[in-house]
Amino acid sequence: MKKPIVAVIAGGYSGEHSVSLKSAAGILSWLGSEPFSTFLVLIERDRWSVRVSEQREVPLDKNDFSFDLDGERIRFDYAYITIHGTPGENGLLQGYLDMIGIPYNTGDTLVESLTFNKYVCNRFLSGFGIRIADSMRLTGRDTQPDVADLIARMGLPLFVKPNVGGSSIATTKVVEAAQLLPAIEQAFSEGEEVMIERLICGTEVTCGAFLRKKEVVALPVTEVVAHNEFFDFDAKYNGAVEEITPARISDEATRLIQTMTARIYELLNARGIIRVDYIIEADGIPTLLEVNTTPGMTPTSFIPQQVRAAGMDMKEVLCTIIRDGLNETQ
């Protein structure tokens, strides 16, 4: 029987391009050559290509998601999206794949566009009783807000960050009024909307989840102890953080985080692997920070740590997701 041909899609148009390539390398190493034939698909603004060997790339035909290899026309059976940012995390790529009938590992266009907008996603989930931080959104019309009015409403300290995007790029902790406008300008440099969020104090944790045989599996919880003021890009990717899996929290708190994560997965009708970040405040109740539907997948990322702590391996988890996706289309 012919092996299914799987595209591991990486790259994208955002500042997280390099992170995406590292995640793709991790996924390809775990999948290996069995039970699927896997290829790296690189998406750039001016070119979509397939890496068929270390030294060779060939163009990808966007009409049917296929490519020519030595005279043979090869069409992908499945797409594993590991783009962090646009177009893989905001629903654009999902819409394209839906139109040409290629199954994939994430939520659909609606789910991805919702979760990519931090402010809107958190507001949506708060309607189901999920606690969120006090926040506000600025659009392109609000590039010079009244600082005094904003601080009177939100207080200090607070966080300023792009409303879409990830990896804590252009995120600033603001502790005094003079820092606010520069922080807003920096966040606007990465996108058209800015989210301002009240500082939450407590223990930062994160929990992954995936679907196995139509049941949501919540993974062990990781505690995040940043050596910087907060878990910024440097902490995430340059080692300025301590990541403890399982987290040093009570069994009751662990169960609560896992239950909330599974519920968020179901409320969003998510697919594949997601990761949800929280702060456990002094009252023991978790406050939602954000939902990530294409989490980092390098060997040292949170999800692989949690999978190992659960006694599973990444190949097993990835193959489960891909097989389930292929079976749904048969």
Swiss-Prot record:
Pathway: Cell wall biogenesis; peptidoglycan biosynthesis. Binds 2 magnesium or manganese ions per subunit. Pfam families: Dala_Dala_lig_C, Dala_Dala_lig_N. Residues 122-323 form the ATP-grasp domain. Mg(2+) 2 binds at residues 290, 292. Its main location: cytoplasm. It catalyses: 2 D-alanine + ATP = D-alanyl-D-alanine + ADP + phosphate + H(+). Keywords: ATP-binding, Cell shape, Cell wall biogenesis/degradation, Cytoplasm, Ligase, Magnesium, Manganese, Metal-binding, Nucleotide-binding, Peptidoglycan synthesis. Mg(2+) 1 binds at residues 277, 290. GO terms for molecular function: ATP binding; D-alanine-D-alanine ligase activity; metal ion binding. ATP binds at residues 151-206. GO terms for biological process: cell wall organization; peptidoglycan biosynthetic process; regulation of cell shape. One of its GO terms (cellular component) is cytoplasm. Its cofactor is Mg(2+); Mn(2+). InterPro entries: ATP-grasp (IPR011761), ATP_grasp_subdomain_1 (IPR013815), D-Ala_lig_Van_CS (IPR000291), D_ala_D_ala (IPR005905), Dala_Dala_lig_C (IPR011095), Dala_Dala_lig_N (IPR011127), PreATP-grasp_dom_sf (IPR016185). It is found in: Cytoplasm. It is an enzyme of class 6 (ligase). It comes from the Bacteria. Its EC number is 6.3.2.4. Belongs to the D-alanine--D-alanine ligase family. Cell wall formation. This is D-alanine--D-alanine ligase. The gene is ddl.
